[in-house]
Every structure is written in structure tokens, then in C-alpha cells.
Amino acid sequence: MSTAQVPYLNCIRNTLTASMCLQNFGSQIVERHNKPEVEVKTSKELVLNPVIIARNKNERVLIETSINSIRISVSIKKSDEVDVILAKKFVRFLQQRAENFIILRRKPVEGYDISFLVTNFHTENMFKHKLVDFIIQFMEDIDREISDLKLTLNARGRIVASEYLKNFA
């Protein structure tokens, strides 16, 4: 992790830790139903104000909290067109395997690349600090993987170009 990312990730970690105070809350409309309020938004008093933590205009996190759920949406760093293509392919690969991640949503919030949904059942079954650590580690790993893929792609392109130009020499 680069030192420039540390304050950004610490801010996200602290905000997630503070907002993980979820509790069981049954539906006010249908008896014995418990749906994540951040998704259904049946009543305004149960949904808190969303928080956006941005490092720049392309790299930001949206944290939406309600009484029984929290939705974390991440926009991945995209500095050029190669990053955009790699991020899109990588996110699509992960979303196809969303059931393996438990808290990963198949469809992200509009304007973001990837989203997580944590409900009170997740916080009852798992440690809250481990959930926060997973999300932060996930963000670090995505950045690292995309950077590695970009380096590999550039090296491969350089090799292909040099082999092609050897034919003209």
C-alpha cells in the first residue's frame, strides 16, 4: 500500500467501524419480514445520511447506513483508458462470483464500480472489525491487482511491438 493511500483508507476504516452498529429491525409493513432498509428505503427515519469519502473525483467510497444494514459502494481508481478496461473486467469477474464473498452485491450502485451490503445478520455471525478489515484489504488488493495487470500488459505490449518491428529491420 502506498503512503498516499494510508489517510484515505484510515478514514474509510474509521467511518465503517463507527457505522457498523447495526441491530435487528423487522419490517413495519409486513409481519415477520426483515429486509435491509438501506435497500428498500420504506421509511426515512430508518435511513441515515450517506457519507462520501473521496480521494479524487474518480476514487471515492459511498457509505449508506440504516438501522439494520450498511451499503458500501466503491469507485476504483481509473487514471487512463487501460485502467478503465482492466477495472471493468476485474469487477465483472468478481461480481460473477458474488455468492462466494457473502457481502458482495451482484449489481453496484449507479456511478460506482463495486458494492457491498452488510446486514445485521452478518454482524451477528461475523466479527465487525474483521468485516471492516476485509473491505479495506479488498480495496488495497483491487488497486494492487489492477496496477500489476497494467504493468504486465505494458510489458507484453512492449515485447509484441519489438518483435513486430524486428521484421522491418
Curated annotation (Swiss-Prot):
Q: What is its biological role?
A: Functions as a component of the Arp2/3 complex which is involved in regulation of actin polymerization and together with an activating nucleation-promoting factor (NPF) mediates the formation of branched actin networks. Seems to contact the pointed end of the daughter actin filament. The Arp2/3 complex is involved in organizing the actin system in cell motility and chemotaxis, in phagocytosis and macropinocytosis, at late steps of endosome processing, and in mitosis.
Q: Its Gene Ontology biological processes?
A: actin filament polymerization; actin nucleation; Arp2/3 complex-mediated actin nucleation; exocytosis; phagocytosis
Q: Which GO terms describe its cellular component?
A: Arp2/3 protein complex; cell cortex; cytosol; pathogen-containing vacuole; pseudopodium
Give the family, as the similarity comment puts it.
Belongs to the ARPC4 family.
What PANTHER family would the database entry show?
Answer: ACTIN-RELATED PROTEIN 2_3 COMPLEX SUBUNIT 4, ARP2/3 COMPLEX 20 KD SUBUNIT
- Name the domain of life: Eukaryota
Where in this chain does the entry annotate a coiled-coil region? none
Q: How does it assemble?
A: Component of the Arp2/3 complex composed of arpB/Arp2, arpC/Arp3, arcA/p41-arc, arcB/p34-arc, arcC/p21-arc, arcD/p20-arc and arcE/p16-arc. Interacts with carmil (via the region between the LRR domain and COOH-terminal proline-rich domain); carmil is required for Arp2/3-dependent actin nucleation. Arp2/3 complex, MyoB, MyoC, and the alpha and beta subunits of capping protein all form a larger complex with carmil.
**GO MF annotations in UniProt:** actin filament binding
Location(s), subcellular:
Cytoplasm, Cytoskeleton; Cytoplasm, Cytosol; Cytoplasm, Cell cortex; Cell projection, Pseudopodium
Q: Which organism is it from?
A: Dictyostelium discoideum (Social amoeba)
Keywords, comma-separated and alphabetical: Actin-binding, Cell projection, Cytoplasm, Cytoskeleton
Please list every transmembrane segment annotated in the UniProt record, as residue ranges. none
Protein name from the UniProt record = Actin-related protein 2/3 complex subunit 4
Provide an example Pfam family for this protein.
Answer: ARPC4
Could you say which residues form the signal peptide? none
